[in-house]
Amino acid sequence: MRINGVLNKAAWALVMTAGAASTQAAQKVCVFDILGASGDAFNMAKDYGLAMQKQGVTLELKAYTNEGVATEDFRAGQCDALLASAFRTRQFNTVSGAIDTLGSTTMIKNGKIDMAASYDVVRKVIQTYASPQAAKLMVQGNYEIGGIFPFGAAYPVINDRSITTVEALAGKKIAAFDHDKAQALMIQRVGGQPVSADISNFAAKFNNGSVDMIAAPSLAYKPLELQKGIGAKGGIARFPIMILTYQLVLNQAKFPAGFGEKSRNHWLGEFDRAMSMIKNADAGIPAAAWIDLPPENAQKYNLMLRESRLDIASKGIYDAQGLKVIKKVRCSMNAADAECTTKSEEG
C-alpha cells in the first residue's frame, strides 16, 4: 500500500510537471489583421500554428485590429512574436524591412511595369532570407524575423482622376503613416501635403475627404470600403509604389534554437497562397475603378521612386544592406538594366 501510495504521488507529480511544461511551452503571437480573427492574415497564422505544433512549439494567437497596440504589446513582452506589416516590423529588423521601400521590387521590361516579375523579385528575396546562409541577417538584437509573405502592391488611390501625374500632386493632401518617416519625405518631394495617419484611420480620412490620396493594396479595397472615397470621380492608378509584405518577428529568447529557420521556411511555402489572395483582390476591384498610366509615365515615375529611395537611404531611414540584396535580385533578373552598371545601393 505504501509503495503504491508513493508511486501514485510520483505519477501525480509527473503529470503536474508535464502540465506546467506544456503551459510554459505555449508562445503568444500578436497577429494584426484589419478584420481581426476572421481575416486572411489571421487564418494564415492559424495554419502556421498547426504547422509549428508538429515542430514541437505550441502557439497561442491573439488577434488585433489595431496594429500600433499589437506592436506595443509585443514590445512590452505581452506577446512572444508579432505578425504585422513591415512598416511596423522594420523597427525590429531593418534588413528585411527594406523590401517595403519605394520601387525597390518593381521590374520594368520593354518600357512597361512587369507585375509578375516584380512579385518574383519579392519571392526571390524571401527565398534568400529563408536560406541558412542569410540567417544572421534575420537577427538584430533580441529579435529574429520568422517569416515574410507578400500583401500586394501599394497603389495610389485618388478621389479625382485628374491627379494622375506627379505634377498634379502639388498641394494635394496625402496620408502619411507616422511610423514610416519615408512617406512624408516622399510626399514633400513631389509637392504634396503629408497628413498624419496610421493603418487604423488612413482609409477613414480618405473616405471622408480629409485627404485626396492614399496608398493601399487591393486587399484593402473591400474591407476598408475605399469605393466611398473614390466615388464617381476617383480611381486606383495601376502603378506600384512598392510591394507590401507582412513579417513575423520573434523574441528570439522565447523560442528554441533553430526555430527561426523552420518558421521562415514555412512562410516561404505560403507565398503562392498569399499571391492567390492578392490576385483575387485585384480581380474583385471593378474594372472602371482602375486607371492605367501611359507606359512612359510609369517608367518615369519608377525612376523618380528610385531617386527618392536613394535619397531616403542616404538619410539612414532605409537599410543599405537590405537594399543591396534586393538590387542583386533585380539585376539577376534583368542585367541589361542601366542601374546594374552603377554602384548605387551596393554600399
Task: Place the predicted regions along the sequence by residue.
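Bacterial N-terminal signal peptides that target proteins for export
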Residues: 1-12
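Extracytoplasmic "Venus flytrap"
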Residues: 26-47
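Contiguous mixed-secondary-structure segments that line small-molecule binding/active-site clefts
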Residues: 50, 75, 87-173, 179, ...
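Sec/Tat signal peptide C-region and signal peptidase I cleavage site
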Residues: 19-26
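Signal peptide-proximal N-terminal region
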Residues: 49-59
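Short helix-initiation/N-cap motifs at beta->coil->alpha
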Residues: 60-72, 178-181, 193-208
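Pocket-flanking alpha-helical
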Residues: 64-104, 157-161, 214, 218-230
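A beta-strand-loop signature enriched in Asp, Gly, Thr, and Trp
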Residues: 222-239, 245-251
